[in-house]
């Protein structure tokens, strides 16, 4: 009876079993497909997270490299400014004249009356000493502002250069990796097509092969890229050696307007000196960063076409120069982008922010150094007239001049080993500088 029932409903049972089996298989396939889809999504999110972290790490490392580069360039700037605006020699000369005058006073005290001729020599010495103090007053202020503006421009230029190069390197690496992954996928999925292509080629079914375009050897391409990048980075030589001279007359003119009428014996409070220095900086900013005179800023930052070859000859060897003569297309692209960035409003805002930070640093250092010099005998300044002890706390202009000299030394301190140049650290921490660097680094549309 049961066998008869099974035989009678065998078709239905088989059909039902097939349907159930199909549903189970479909469910398993759907589950596997869903699992694979989830795995792919997780992998994609993981890759995106990795890429973002990689970009952040590269960006952070690039900014650190820029700071290290500044530590390497500051000693060069110190040598250049020390030669062009030598205030140490003036101070040593003044010290020598003070010792000489003290010796003459001792001789007059022990040897009786001095002759008329000796009095004439003494007046000459006194007059030349006054002239030296006047020169120290002007030169120390000019050097201070030259240090401020050159260092700020050098930091901006270094950030622009390294971030542009880092972005290009990242894009080239990403494209190379993407091509490699695409080739791997083609090799894994197209083995049957490869067999067919091989057979078709053997039968002549593919027709003539397309002509192969000559490609530059990899080694030569890498050499050209490397030399162009080095040439691009070496252009900071211009700012260090020639570029800062473009705005030096502007600084001298503004310093003369604010400090020219002051005598080294005149006294100013810290607030009064700060106001004069601030007025000088604002006047320089108006002419240097004004939208109508950005040509002066560009001439200071980068050499023009007539000076570019001279700069490269100073920084590259003969082999590298031959590579540049053969192909400088990458250098041209890098320079064009740097000029666009330097001319932008964002760069001007960054420069003004760096100069303002420099002013704050200078005033802090100045107050500390002036106060410290009052605690010990002023061996290298004119005799104090008691104004420094007054309640108004006014100090001689001569004392400010010597303090400015010391401030320049602090700002140009060689901290390459210990990385302890406080001035560079303060500039490197300016938020606007990081904002501009991030904008340049992430500008993948260039």
Curated annotation (Swiss-Prot):
It is found in: Peroxisome membrane. Pfam families: Peroxin-3 (PF04882). GO terms for molecular function: protein-macromolecule adaptor activity. Residues 34-446 are cytoplasmic. GO terms for biological process: ER-dependent peroxisome organization; peroxisome inheritance; protein import into peroxisome membrane. This is Peroxisomal biogenesis factor 3. It is a single-pass membrane protein. It comes from Eremothecium gossypii (strain ATCC 10895 / CBS 109.51 / FGSC 9923 / NRRL Y-1056). Its main location: membrane. Belongs to the peroxin-3 family. The chain crosses the membrane at residues 13-33. Keywords: Membrane, Peroxisome, Peroxisome biogenesis, Transmembrane, Transmembrane helix. Residues 1-12 are peroxisomal. GO terms for cellular component: endoplasmic reticulum; peroxisomal membrane. InterPro entries: Peroxin-3 (IPR006966). Residues 101-122 are annotated as: Disordered. It comes from the Eukaryota. Involved in peroxisome biosynthesis.
